[in-house]
């Protein structure tokens, strides 16, 4: 320290000022509770297990490859998020299974958890960008150490597919074998059990079938909609036929015939059942009616929350399809047309899974096929408006449950 008396006086004065400021600093008035023992951050999260679970196969073989660590951490992060998605999905399914969804107060809880799944999948899509900082040559350096491990063997992702409602008969065979053949013992049993449980699709289907307003002896939405649509098509045909002969007139009549055929199929229950049997439709005939009713009356307070749920279910399907596509692109970029480490055809197999076969809520997407002018939608008179608002009290299918759900 300098021998200058002036400097010493200024230094001491400044130090005392800082000490005084620290004594009066409200940001420093807390108590360090961790110093007194008890549960601390690392113990609560069991970080000793998580951060030491990255075992590099290349290092075990005496040839440590730097980027294998990124590969492991990224996939472990995927699995942790899959675990959270399953946690949310199981809770939503339990609300439906227990009947608590009939208490409309629980619909907010359902919507919140389904929306959380949507947000997780958006995060998982972004995660590919981190993995793609590794080049194909970087991956090649340690790929030989991974076989026969394969992403197809992700138990949690297969459970997720099953619990959402991917039909096992719509799956693309894996090397001409049933997908469960690639899992052992307890894992195979868990997958079989998940196939036998009610899926989210089935539970949503049952919920849609109870949509108030579908009753033939009540509002009779379906009967009124059918009448309005074909009356509207008849008026359109008369309007077009009044136009002078032209190529445009013929095109308009041809388009009208196509529209009529589309709506004939919509109101043909036998045709619907046939499309369900071939996998082109997934929802029951009555559930489709409920979904379309929610779609048309989405601005009514009674149907705003259900419409948000249907939108989120489509978001999940969309994001899972994008996830598959991003995975396909990444695999193609990393290994080209080589076989996968698990023995599949790699890129070729993965590309075949990016299709509507794996879309669970495809019927919700197809609702847009049946869009009609707003004035064709059956009008609600004042008493019917009241019915919609009071549905949870008046409709036995939507009556409030006295039970609480988690």
Curated annotation (Swiss-Prot):
Cofactor requirements of the protein: heme
One Gene Ontology term of the molecular function aspect: metal ion binding
Family matches, as Pfam families: Trp_dioxygenase (PF03301)
List of residues binding substrate: 71-75, 143, 341
A biological process from GO: L-tryptophan catabolic process to kynurenine
Reactions that this protein is recorded to catalyse: L-tryptophan + O2 = N-formyl-L-kynurenine
Broad enzyme group: oxidoreductase
Assigned keywords, A-Z: Dioxygenase, Heme, Iron, Metal-binding, Oxidoreductase, Tryptophan catabolism
Cofactor binding remark: Binds 1 heme group per subunit.
Signal peptide positions on this chain: none
UniProt: heme binding residues: 327
Enzyme Commission number(s) of this protein: 1.13.11.11
Pathway connected to this protein: Amino-acid degradation; L-tryptophan degradation via kynurenine pathway; L-kynurenine from L-tryptophan: step 1/2
Physiological role: Heme-dependent dioxygenase that catalyzes the oxidative cleavage of the L-tryptophan (L-Trp) pyrrole ring and converts L-tryptophan to N-formyl-L-kynurenine. Catalyzes the oxidative cleavage of the indole moiety.
Protein family according to the UniProt entry: Belongs to the tryptophan 2,3-dioxygenase family.
Quaternary context: Homotetramer. Dimer of dimers.
Protein's name according to its UniProt entry: Tryptophan 2,3-dioxygenase A
Native source organism of the sequence: Danio rerio (Zebrafish)
Protein's gene: tdo2a
